Design a protein with these regions (language model features):
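Intrinsically disordered or low-complexity boundary/linker segments at protein termini
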Residues: 1-16, 117-131
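Small/aliphatic-rich secondary-structure junction motif
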Residues: 2-46
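Structural motif corresponding to alpha-helix initiation and N-cap regions
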Residues: 17, 73-77, 113
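Active-site phosphate/pyrophosphate- and oxyanion-stabilizing loops and adjacent acidic/basic residues
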Residues: 21, 54, 80, 117
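General small-molecule cofactor/ligand-binding pocket signal
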Residues: 34-36, 66-70, 128-130
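Short, surface-exposed acidic-centric catalytic microdomains
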Residues: 39-59
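Mid-chain, well-packed structural core segment of small domains
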Residues: 61-98, 102
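Gly/Ser-rich helix-loop-strand patches that form or flank binding pockets
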Residues: 90-131
């Protein structure tokens, strides 16, 4: 059983749809699929899991996913925290988030690591970038 974390923006964008599609591509019965939106506190966003689920299901129909909305100030921190919390095997992010994740982890660790290598080493997680 694999756990896949798919990060999206709300309202959903074209990048969000592509990221969800990639997460669904590898889904098998018994796997855990988690759709994550980080609601940034500094933006005053207040998105409910129900709204996120309704938006995803309007495009993809009912899918076997858990919907999570995290609130935080730092997008990258919330994604890494949720990946660790869920013990994710795969994390799918849009290409625009890759650079931000790399910089955030670089600041956190005092260097600029290969984000894929760091997630694989420290969390046993595979990161996939969706173009």
């Amino acid at each position: 059983m694999a756990t896949t974390l798919v990060t999206v923006r709300y309202p959903l964008t074209a990048d969000s749809y592509r990221t969800i599609e990639r997460g669904l591509d590898g889904y098998e019965d018994g796997d855990s699929l988690i759709i994550l939106h980080v609601s940034l506190l500094q933006n005053g966003d207040r998105i409910s899991r129900g709204k996120l689920q309704a938006a995803v299901e309007a495009e993809f129909g009912e899918i076997p996913a858990h919907y999570v909305v995290r609130r935080g100030y730092v997008l990258e921190e919330a994604i890494v925290d949720e990946a660790a919390r869920q013990n994710a095997d795969h994390v799918f992010v849009g290409k625009s988030k890759r650079g931000r994740l790399r910089r955030w982890i670089g600041r956190l660790l005092g260097l600029y690591p290969d984000i894929e290598a760091e997630l694989a080493k420290n969390l046993n997680t595979k990161l996939e970038i969706v173009d």
